[in-house]
């Protein structure tokens, strides 16, 4: 074990990669974070500082998580206030895990027919027609009202200071410049982001003070609503909910809808007024003495639980970390779990029958049946969804669709022959060690917070990232999450677009408990790779004995065989990302097994996590060793 630190520790971002040899005992590129009293970790240094400031004010982990959420939504390259927030909260008073569903819904008029009439196969990736109703403001306000201690005024103070002006990071400033063609399509976005119109570089310079007066005015309205309610004798909770009402039913809603519709959006005042945050029961499974909690099937989170159920009977330690057999086992169970995700997951609201078969999907017997079909000699490029209904005593209402389900979407085109293909040992044609997709870093962040009272919060907020379409004079970037719907039942019967429905999303915070007490809190960005990376992080800790920082930095694999949740929803059977330092013999063996290999310098996903050291009564923090992920502990 590493020595405990008695002074506050800070995790600093750096760009480095780790080899695959001897990782269980490897030195890390960043030190582990240690704390006795509290911990705040997220994807941005300024946002982590906002969490630390909130703890110093006397806030609990929920207050700190909300402050970090407000700060990250003010920084735009990961998300905006118009996006969506998903959270798991451990309440030490009840010893229960709580799920927060603050995902927006498709607005009135958003139907398959609407998009087909515009020659679209899916809702668009960007712009006002990509937007569901804003969820993050409601999620933050409900979490704070129900489980926090501080006022909204205190919690929003760091974000409001940032909206007044903060030195913009190079990552966002350069992303604005790259995306300025899109940004110029929307007048409010153009006015906000392109601070040097007509210049060779129209985006802000790195380090330039970036000001958001419209957003500051919106946040001020929320605080004013709270303070007026308090002055009128309302309770703390009711005063915060007065701010909620002002956002979703008051003048903020009016300007949001006006700005959306002016630019071609579909939102109505009724859409915002009817939308509500849901406080839900999470789903869970057990894995060798650990209880692992995820959000319900409106996220992809249960796919990680299905994978754990399939892996539990296997001797992963004997296979060896990132051995050929271990990689193959991971890839195959992920094939199966994500095939089920693509077919069976969707909004479980009673208004959208039939109900998703979550009981069968999470059945251990179903997992054993699925794993029994794994071919240990080759990748199964035709892995399809199973039928979980018999494992919950039911009949599959979509049996006919299941029988016709294609293995890949869209059906793959024959690859052109290449004289070099034999020499590449299964490498994806044209792929190189620096071929990292920009989308890997595009949107979403993760937030982890914990305190000495026992509150633990894990959040995966997203939506409204750059290039964001700003809704009028609110300063709020609208979500892009509607693209995760499909328009036809043949592509996913539970996730077909309907007004008022939530899309099935990739966002997936995670809590693991041991003996009823928090053991790990973890989350990551990365779209369809999120649960792949969290699965491997969890196994790194519980199977291979890595510390939380070692597990965060350790190279993972990523599969692209599942259907993408974005854009054209493409799947690439057999495509696997391996770390560039994966041994040549492992690459050769995997190539012979039918894998299409792409080498990458970064494969672990920017994971942030907290480990609870019960032996010493302390917390260990782990934070990604590339990007801007950052933490503070005390």
Predicted features by range, described:
Residues 78, 129-130, 207, 282, ...:
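Short Gly/Pro-enriched turn/cap motifs at secondary-structure boundaries
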Residues 9-22:
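Bacterial N-terminal signal peptides
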Residues 25-49, 53, 57-242, 247-299:
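Noncatalytic scaffold domains of N-terminal-nucleophile
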Residues 338, 453, 500-503, 534-535, ...:
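Extended C-terminal subregions enriched in glycine
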Residues 105, 464-466, 526-527:
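A short acidic/small-residue loop/turn micro-motif
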Residues 74-99, 116, 258, 263-268, ...:
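Active-site rim segments in enzyme catalytic domains, especially the processed small/beta chain
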Residues 253, 257, 316-462, 473, ...:
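Internal maturation/activation junctions in enzymes
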